[in-house]
Regions:
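Short amphipathic, charge-patterned alpha-helical segments
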Residues: 105-109, 251-267
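Intrinsic disorder at enzyme termini
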Residues: 1-20, 183, 190-194, 200, ...
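Immediate flanking context of iron-sulfur cluster ligation sites
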Residues: 39-50, 264-275, 316-337, 354-381, ...
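Short Lys/Arg-rich basic patches
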Residues: 447-459, 466-469
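Hydrophobic alpha-helical positions that pack around
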Residues: 130-251, 263
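Iron-sulfur-cluster electron-transfer modules
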Residues: 1-179, 429-442
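Local cysteine-cluster metal-coordination motifs and their immediate loop/turn environment
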Residues: 47-61, 158-160, 272-282, 303, ...
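Short, basic amphipathic alpha-helical segments that act as recognition/interaction helices
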Residues: 472-489
Length: 489
């Protein structure tokens, strides 16, 4: 029987060198790809059935072929490592353990489509992942050859992970999505009239699957997963489970098995109330837990696999509070280029907020929130308003009785539920959430907490400091300011 473990991405311990990675894989996939005709490699990617692991599940071979066959001969390869979907941490975990497979996959893609310009877009806060990528690039110079690979550090915004906004960041702009009718494989990087410069934009996990397909073949890759979604998937399981973590399993494992067997189930004998597949798909209720987690099966229940980040909420969860968190997150992260998106999500978020205040809660809040969410996707450049029009109404209509109770008892369930934006993971300890997200405002700035009276700077400190400044150095001025502040004289 063929050894399908060679297609798995995450080693037991992180690879500390390219040599260690190669000793495990046994073959140089990049060298093999260069010894094959690009069409032969593309045929193998097509035959493997590899689908994008970043959200939509688009066939990888189809995307590559679009760029390869584009009449413009200036082409780019772009890795989307700007992970930010709530409940997802798999790309960061992959880059910490195996950046070599990601880079090899990019080099192979470049060979197929005829590109020597490669970019990896990643959030500047991902310090460990950036360090591992840079070290891997240095160690792989011989394989990289005359290609150039640049790591581009970008902002914290959720929309940085949207592929058209990601290209804008690489070009030095804000993470604002381009018009929807210009996908990257038609208009890529640094485009100009007559030179659209198409780009392959794939998720980090997608690229990481490519080397093993080249080494072992499409048939071997298809021995894992399902016909709809071949191969393995990096699942992130968080929330109310005993063993939260990032788990690599064959695509199609039932969600119930992921929760109960892989992640240890819901603690204390509690029951699952709802599962979020990020904030991009319809929430999953207990009657759907036996669904296989591949793209097709999840679509059949009206939800989506997305980036395979599942957040489990037990039966103590108050759904209006969860809907409040989701609505606020999407409203805050909207870029305001499409007025219907920002205004619709503002309406939804504010209406749900008002249900928690006895001074503002009215019977109009529920229909107003539904209207706002459903009105958001009009002329949209990206998928964010569509997410709002799906996730928010699904929570509201699926648990309407809780919203009725909330209206009648506005202060009974006041404790907020944080949006599960995962900042770090430590095995055995679990996930840390991004504590700054709650302070983010709709203009993408951050609120600051009031300064306590005990540490407030006296209003006359500047004048007193100027009187005594003289020819003091900067360091001396800082010390003097501190002394004046502390002694009040």
């Amino acid at each position: 029987m063929a050894d399908t473990r060679q297609h798995w991405l995450i080693p037991d311990a992180p690879y500390e060198s390219y040599a260690a990675y190669q000793s495990h894989t046994g073959h140089d996939a990049v060298a093999k790809a260069h010894n094959l005709d690009p069409d032969a490699v593309l045929d193998e990617i097509h035959a493997s059935g590899l689908r994008g692991r970043g959200g939509a599940g688009f066939p990888t071979g189809t995307k590559w072929a679009s760029v390869k066959n584009h009449p413009c001969d200036i082409r780019y390869i772009v890795c989307n490592a700007a992970e930010g979907e709530p409940g997802t941490f798999k790309d960061r975990w992959l880059l910490r353990h195996n950046p070599y497979a990601v880079i090899e996959g990019m080099l192979i893609a470049g060979r197929v489509v005829g590109s020597r310009r490669l970019y990896i877009a990643i959030k500047h806060s991902f310090h460990e992942e950036i360090a591992r990528l840079n070290r891997a690039i240095e160690q792989m110079r011989d394989s990289i050859g005359d290609c150039s690979i640049e790591v581009v550090e970008g902002p914290e915004e959720y929309l940085f992970g949207e592929e058209k906004a990601l290209l804008e960041v690489i070009e030095g702009n804000e993470p604002l999505p381009r018009e929807a009718h210009y996908p990257p494989y038609e208009r890529g990087l640094f485009a100009s009239p007559g030179s659209p410069n198409p780009a392959v934009v794939n998720n980090a996990e997608t690229f990481a699957h490519v080397p093993s397909i080249v080494r072992a073949g499409a048939a071997s890759f298809r021995m894992q997963g399902t016909a709809d979604t071949p191969g393995t998937v990096l699942y992130t399981i968080s929330g109310d489970v005993a063993r939260p973590g990032i788990y690599e399993r064959e695509a199609g494992i039932p969600l119930r098995e992921l929760i109960d067997d892989v992640a240890g189930g819901v603690p204390d004998g509690r029951k699952v109330k709802v599962v979020l597949s990020g904030v991009a798909a319809k929430p999953i209720t207990p009657d759907k837990l036996d669904t296989r987690t591949d793209f097709g099966s999840m679509h059949l229940i009206g939800s989506g696999l997305g980036s395979a980040g599942f957040v489990v909420y037990d039966d103590r969860t108050w759904i209006p509070s969860l809907a409040r968190a989701v609505a606020r997150f999407l409203f805050v992260e909207s870029c305001n280029q499409c007025s219907a998106c920002k205004s619709g999500l503002r309406t939804a978020s504010q209406a749900i907020d008002e249900l928690f205040d006895p001074a503002t809660a009215t019977t109009d809040d529920y229909p107003r929130a539904l209207y706002g969410a459903r009105a958001a996707p009009q002329g949209n450049r990206c998928y964010l308003p569509v997410q709002g029009s799906v996730v928010i109404p699904s929570l509201m209509t699926g648990f309407a009785s809780e919203f009725e109770h909330q209206l009648a008892n506005p202060t009974e369930h006041g404790d907020p539920i944080p949006i599960p934006k995962l900042e770090d993971f430590v095995p055995g300890r679990g996930f840390a959430l991004d504590e700054h997200q709650a302070a983010k405002t709709p203009d993408w700035t951050y609120e600051t907490a009031p300064i306590p009276e005990s540490v407030r700077v006296p209003p006359d400190l500047a004048a007193r400091l100027a009187e005594r400044a003289g020819d003091r150095s900067v360091d001396e001025l800082v010390r003097l300011a501190l002394e004046l502040w502390l002694d009040g004289s």
